[in-house]
Amino acid sequence: SWTSDRRTEILERAKHFSKKFEPLSAAGWSLRGCGAYFAFVDHPFKEGSETLAPLILRDQGILLMPGTMFYPKYDPHGPRTFRIAFANIDKNKITTLLERLKNLSYQRFDRKEYNEVK
């Protein structure tokens, strides 16, 4: 049925996102969670997600939602996190998206320092 096929497609897309995200770990990214339509990821940069989101849109044409839109103000994860929507792109575009994120070259922060603040 259409519903069953659509469900399978959605689940496969989420699985593909998680699998293709793995190489980003070496570049300092981490996958906080991945659902059927969105993923929450920690980025490796010194600047917060609110500052970086418009820069990434300008430089790479990638629209990311800053984590500060989804976390309480006092939560330190908000500035370190992006929400990525992948519901309307196919597996090839997911792969391209993640390769482009991996190659971003903004100033990176020291993850050890961040882990101590948590």
Name each region found by the language model.
Residues 7-18, 29-43:
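Conserved glycine-rich beta-strand-loop-beta hairpin in the small C-terminal domain of fold type I
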Residues 10, 17, 39, 56-57, ...:
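Generic structural signal for small/hydrophobic residues in well-ordered secondary structure
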Residues 20-25:
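A structural motif corresponding to the C-terminal end of an alpha-helix
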Residues 27-28, 68-73:
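Short, solvent-exposed loop/turn elements at beta->coil junctions and helix N-caps
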Residues 41-45, 86-88:
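Short beta-strand-to-loop capping motifs
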Residues 49-50:
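Structural motif corresponding to alpha-helix initiation and N-cap regions
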Residues 58-64, 73-118:
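PLP-dependent enzyme catalytic core of the Aspartate aminotransferase-like
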